């Protein structure tokens, strides 16, 4: 019984102890909350804390150095909206292109060099073209054409009769062969004035020998002559020849007169004086002929330079030797001299 009582008592006691513990715990929790409320006063408001700080600062002002405080306010710049990737602004694209072009212009060229040319403007030359440019600069300049393209040219086809009826005075100064034609080409210049630039070329047609092809170059700088000399087309006017001395008479009467002349001591010998004058005239004529030959040779050389590229043939100007020889033959004969005859008569 006692054990059962104990067991029942233990059960009742255990139940009563659990209920008391729960009540005590709940009461204990209420006591703890009340204690916390009593021990922790509510926090003071913010303005009171700030006022206490101000009071502390005011109390410490006499002991602190005087300082001035400035407050600056910083405001962030307004944020620009980012450009849309799908449709960029044309102004932005234009600025980007300008920046790229400026950066490319600032870069020095790598394969380009500048050489000072002969002219005032600068030339950009690549490395491969440097040798070619130096070769071109080292070559001598081509000889300029003398009045080649500046004078007008007139070509006429005339017959023999019309060729001889030319009213201008011409002088032939040379000729040269023509490629593909058996007839040579004759060159004439105006003989009326020394400074006249008029020229004439005469050649016989290869198709019709009765037709002459006449090419006039340049213009006359003087009026047309009133009369034309018969030798104007071939050579210049030479000085008039000295009249030949007539041959002495071989009659017996003339021999007697000669003896009287030679025997007279007071009579001067006029025959020797005439012979000396004749020899002096021959020397003067020979000098004039030599001077004219030199002038013709110089003119042939000048005209050879002017006509060097006509018809793509070799320029070989042949001077007018035939006419010159004909004129020289006129003075080739020596005049008769009386000195030998006079000496023979005097000795007899």
From Swiss-Prot:
Belongs to the WRKY group II-e family. PANTHER family: WRKY TRANSCRIPTION FACTOR 27-RELATED, WRKY TRANSCRIPTION FACTOR 30-RELATED-RELATED. Residues 228-242 have a biased composition (Polar residues). The keyword Nucleus applies. The gene is WRKY27. It comes from Arabidopsis thaliana (Mouse-ear cress). Residues 274-315 have a biased composition (Acidic residues). This is Probable WRKY transcription factor 27. The keyword Transcription regulation applies. Keywords: DNA-binding, Nucleus, Transcription, Transcription regulation. Its main location: nucleus. One of its GO terms (molecular function) is sequence-specific DNA binding. Transcription factor. Interacts specifically with the W box (5'-(T)TGAC[CT]-3'), a frequently occurring elicitor-responsive cis-acting element. Residues 143-153 have a biased composition (Basic residues). Signal peptide: none annotated. Residues 75-85 have a biased composition (Pro residues). Residues 159-225 bind DNA. One of its GO terms (cellular component) is nucleus. Residues 19-52, 67-90, 133-153, 218-320 are annotated as: Disordered. One of its GO terms (biological process) is response to gibberellin. It is found in: Nucleus. Residues 133-142 have a biased composition (Low complexity).
